Amino acid sequence: MKLRKHLLWLCLIVCIGLVACPVANAIDAAMPNPPASPTEVSVGVFVADIIDLDEVNENFQIEMILIAVWHDPRLAFDAEKEGTKEKIFQGPYQFAEVYTAWWPQLLILNEVGRGDYNAVKLTVYPDGMVRYAEQRNVLLETPMSLQDYPFDTQRLKAYIVPFGNRKEEVVLKINDGLRQATDE
């Protein structure tokens, strides 16, 4: 009886293993790792508008475009064969459902709440360069020095980190060419 019980458990474990392995492989295939260690990601923020500045609560709301650029040789393609010089994944459906490769999930540490995602676009170039842009409205907390108010000057900061990756996997670099603001 004991032997039969042990064999039954062994069969159950083997069956679960056979079923779980393809699932695990499918999950790994859908969410691959960064292309290299470390993967360098150039990041910049275009500030389109400062919507609100709250000195009392030390926060500010902005409309921004977050831009990230990296190289993933696994995505390289022959432009002539494909009939296009770039592959574009635009909008939440194409980005979330059609594009299945790795991208750096960027988290703003001092963001209050969830913010509004208004647009997303990911472009893959023939050499494997990838450009990601998302337009969002965010509320950010930052310490303010108000001693000279109303003649003060403030540095409004956003702290961006790669979510879900260790520093050995993804390194963010500020790209001044991607860091801008409107003149208004």
Where are these regions (language model features)?
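N-terminal secretory signal peptides that target proteins for export/translocation
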Residues: 1-5
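Extracytoplasmic entry segments of secretory-pathway proteins
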Residues: 6-7, 23-25
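Bacterial N-terminal signal peptides
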Residues: 9-20
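Soluble non-transmembrane domains of integral membrane proteins
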Residues: 25-184
